[in-house]
Structure formats: structure tokens, C-alpha cells
Amino acid sequence: MKQLLDFLPLVIFFAVYKFFDIYIASGALIAATALQLIISYMLYKKLEKMHLITFAMVSVFGSLTLILHDDSFIKWKVTIVYALFAIALAVSQFMNKPILKSMLGKELVVEDKIWAHVTWYWVLFFVVCGLVNIYVAFSLSQETWVNFKVFGLTALTLINTVLTVFYLFKNMSEEDKKELK
């Protein structure tokens, strides 16, 4: 349920874009992200930092898109969010408090060096995706960018997540692997 809720704003953005335009879709994205927060709080009685940051970014860049009638802002939002994620991961690693380990370390027990590899892998992933987003957003058509944002980046993130889980699982002890089953 939680993962489906994460896709709610993206699905609404895409559907509204297909029937209307980028501006109405940007407004719908703001509303859908707010709705996501409300539903998440009602179901889980807490709000995740990532959702709050995403809502803030969507609100700021979506509002600028609407007020200034310039789709560049909503396009930049993707890259800026990815840059913030990359920075947060890098800083957490430098401070020896890796975010990914704190999120998944209880379920997936691996050595700290493996968490460092995973962290830097995700930093690189977010940087590359942010740069590719800039290229697609400002070199190709708006429709191509929307499709890339919705399908391309989502697929890349899912693939990256699966690769990360395989890598972590491969580096777990046999005893810890048995505990997961």
C-alpha cells in the first residue's frame, strides 16, 4: 500500500497531462502530493521526511510553473530533488551515519563497507538521473520529457532498487539470509 501511495502523485500528474496540459498537470501534482501526505498520515500516523521534502519542492516549483506560466520550473524540480537526495546520501556517508543503512540495516545486515558502496552507487545514480533529466527536459519535446519522467525515471529507479537488493543480499552472511526467509 505504501509503495502504491508513493506513485499516486506521479500517476495523477501523467493522467492530467495527457488530458490537459503541463500547467494543469502541475497544479494536479501539487494537490496529489498534498493528498499523499494526508493519506499517509491518516494510515501511518507519521510523515516521512522524503515525502515532506518532495511536497515542499513540488509546491515551490509547481507554483512557480503556474504563476510564471513557465514549465522550466517543474522540469528543474526533478533534477533539484535528485541533487538533494545525492547530497543527503553523501553527507550522511561522510558523517558515518549512512541513511540507507539506518533505513534498511535492521532487515539487511551487511558490513559497513557494503553500505558505503550502496550509498555511493545511489549518489551516482541520482547525479546521473538529474543530469539526464536536464538533457531530456531542455533538448527534447515536453511530451518526451513527461514520458521520460513518468516511465523512464520510474523504471530506472525500480531497476536500481532491484540491483541494490541483489547486491545487499549477495553480501549478507548465510545465517542472515536464512533469517529473512
Curated annotation (Swiss-Prot):
Return the NCBIfam families for the record.
ispZ, PRK00259.1-2, PRK00259.1-3
Q: Which gene encodes it?
A: yciB
Naturally occurring in which organism (per UniProt):
Shewanella piezotolerans (strain WP3 / JCM 13877)
Q: Which domain of life is it from?
A: Bacteria
Q: Give the transmembrane region(s).
A: 10-30, 50-70, 80-100, 118-138, 148-168
For this record, the Gene Ontology CC terms, alphabetical, are:
plasma membrane
Q: Which keywords does this chain's UniProt record carry?
A: Cell inner membrane, Cell membrane, Membrane, Transmembrane, Transmembrane helix
Q: Write out the annotated subcellular location.
A: Cell inner membrane
The UniProt record lists the keyword Transmembrane helix:
yes
Q: What is this protein called?
A: Inner membrane-spanning protein YciB
